[in-house]
């Protein structure tokens, strides 16, 4: 009976749809979630340091929660569900520490997300990792042990999460790690974020040339650490200000930091081109503060941008530009196909429902000519279009603000718990009307 109830709850959550109605005026103050990227890195480093002082203000998102549960319980079978970051970071952690033998697995989608690059790299360092099913994909059986470390080469155009996973275990390797990245290096800000977080915990890790990183075999220090708010989460409020018809729109976002190492802090610059002004209450280095977003009244007629260093912002900016009627050509999207879903395909499919037909080039570029098709399948202007989210949190997060321009509904809205659990609550506190259909 309990099993049937569990299945019913899962089915019910999948079938839920939220209809989003915009507020008349956008005037709100939001306490953003803590940075998921920093939380996940800090947790792995916390565990590698001996786990005495838990970082403060950890993200409450699903991705971070599965890492916390895995590190606390260390079960024989570790299910990280849909958390790709957790899969990569925990694989490196389990392979390089003496915590016994474990199987690490996830959702069906996770079992089709490649991990061969990371496994091959760890094996070259001496790790004992076996595939339980299909070669190159989870689940993995890992027997942890101390590794010697040394020199290692990987391609620079792989996911930065593979590189970050290797870097973070560098200090516990007997010889440390010298990591050379061959070819073009994508998502460099995420690598820099990892190095910065490592140094916050006393690691000696730095670029020694344009393509080489040296990590010394120096143990992490155990110290208190406070995690700043998430710039990725902030991006959806930038989108709302950009799309709002309220000339006095004003959003206050708490806990953000000027000079943040988060790659997605580039959202400030991108939205300055789309009519949003960013004002910091304080610019004290290293201190979180409140950021105020207002309309600047200025926007570009066309936008070109390379998202190679901030791929998680792509869905937000694509949706914003379409709704604002700003033609675009976006590059650097090559990692979007191996995220929670094929994000390029998902964007094209869902935006086509709204009359926006995007062109993709070689699975790494998206273009839109600024033309919107007149829809005939929705006879009433009050009829909302239902957006499928493909088990991808950023689809729900990025499409909901389109309510400022058109009636919109979000299928399976609970996916936002992966990175921003309080999103719908925050919208309601900002006078959005959220109706469950």
Q: Locations of the language-model features?
A:
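Short, structured segments at the rim of ligand-binding sites
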Residues: 10-437
